[in-house]
Amino acid sequence: MATMHYLFFGILSVAVLFLGHAGTAAIREQDVPSGYTELRSADPLVEHGDAVAINDYIGSDLRKRIIDSAVQEIGVQEATGNNDGPRVAAYLRYVGLGKGYAWCAAFVSWCYGRAGRPLPRNAWCPALFPMARRYTAAQIGQGSIRQADLFAIYSSSLRRINHVGLVRQQKGNWIVTVEGNSANRGLPKRRPLATIYAFSNWLD
C-alpha cells in the first residue's frame, strides 16, 4: 500500500513538472508581431537620456525621416532669447558646444544625426555648404532641389553664410522650410528662391 502511495505522488509530481514546462515553453514561443521593430536613437544625446526623447521612425525614406525629425521640433523655443533652453542645449551638445551659441546649423546637424546620418555635424553655417556639395544655378533652375537638402542665407554685413535650414519642398519659385534659430525658435517658413544664397546636398 505504501508503495502505491509513493508511486501515485511520483506520477503526480512528474505531471506537474511537465505541465509547468509546457506552459513556460508556450510563453517563450509566442510569436513576436511581424511588424515589430526595436529602434535605437541615432542621436547619442537622446540615446543616453541627455535630451527629451522623441519618436523613432520606421521606414526606408531617409529624406523623409530627416524632415520628420525636424517637423517634430517645430515650436521649440529658447528659454530667455539667448540661445538657451533644454532642447537648444541638446542641439548644441550634439556639435560639441555649450549653451549660448547660434544654433541653426546645430539644429540641421541634429536632425540628420537623428535619422542616422553622421554628417553634416557642424555648428558653423558656411561649413555646411562646401562647393562639392552645392547645387549649380542650372540645377536649381531645373527644379533639382529635394526634400532634406539644405538652404543658406547670406549676410552682407558679415560677408558670409549666417543661416541654414532644411528644405521641406519646393513649390515653383518658393521653398517650404523647417529651420531652427529663426525668431528664437524652430519654425516652418516659405522663402522665395531669389533670397536663397546656396543649396547643398549631403545625401547623394
Where are these regions (language model features)?
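Aromatic- and glycine-rich peptidoglycan recognition patches
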Residues: A2-Y6, G10, G23-P33, V46, ...
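Bacterial N-terminal signal peptides
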Residues: G10-F18
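General secretory precursor processing signal
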Residues: V16, T24, G113-R114, L128
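...with weaker cross-activation on analogous glycine-rich loops/strands in unrelated enzymes
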Residues: L62-D68, L97, R117-L187
